[in-house]
A protein has these predicted regions:
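First exposed extracellular module after export/assembly in secreted or surface-exposed proteins
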Residues: 34-171
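Sec-dependent bacterial lipoprotein signal peptides
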Residues: 1-18
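Bacterial Sec-dependent N-terminal signal peptides
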Residues: 15-40
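A ubiquitous, low-specificity "background" feature that marks scattered single residues
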Residues: 8-9, 19-23, 102, 121
Length: 171
């Protein structure tokens, strides 16, 4: 019985310690190196919470943009020299008194991304017009998933882009 308890305690200890994500596992980090319209385009970084979790951690970058403007924002990765990305776009709308997401193209949400030198993302915001927005428009969203290697590990960082026809104060 004692051997069984020791074995169970050892197994439980190994499982708990191996499931802890350490903070030193660095995500992809970015610095805003250019912003042609800082009054209407802002970027914020909210690091993941420090502590133990059973879920994978992802860093969180949020970009807010007013829909009626255009401009460019450049984000340069500070801890990886070779990044790739994918882009997914959608609209938030009200339909039948319920909020819904509908898929959209880059052109429809007015967001396009280019990887300029393998470590810099140039995000272009096109000016949107009311007549081009879907009925019940609440906002446009783009998710940029950025992939790279940090410390020999494959990592992903999400950059969420929100566009609204309500002007947000830049912080």
């Amino acid at each position: 019985m004692n051997k069984l308890l020791i074995m169970l305690f050892s197994l439980l200890t190994v499982v708990i310690l191996s499931s802890c994500d350490e903070v030193k596992d660095s995500p992809l980090l970015f610095k805003a190196t250019s912003n042609t319209n800082p009054e209407y385009i802002s970027v914020r970084y909210y690091p993941e919470e420090i502590g133990y979790t059973l879920y994978p951690k992802e860093s969180k970058y949020f970009i807010y943009s007013y829909t009626y403007i255009d401009g460019d924002l450049e984000l340069t990765c500070t801890n990886c020299d070779n990044i790739n990305y994918s882009l997914d776009c959608s609209f938030g709308i009200v339909k039948d008194n319920k909020g819904k997401n509908i898929s959209a193209t880059e052109e429809e949400v007015g967001v396009s991304v280019k990887n300029t030198d393998n470590k810099t993302l140039r995000i272009h915001f096109a000016k949107l017009k009311d007549k081009d927005l879907p009925m019940g428009f609440l906002g446009a969203r783009a998710t940029i998933k950025v992939y790279g290697r940090v410390g020999g590990k494959d990592v992903t960082t999400n950059i969420s882009v929100y566009r609204s026809n309500h002007r947000f104060a830049t912080l």
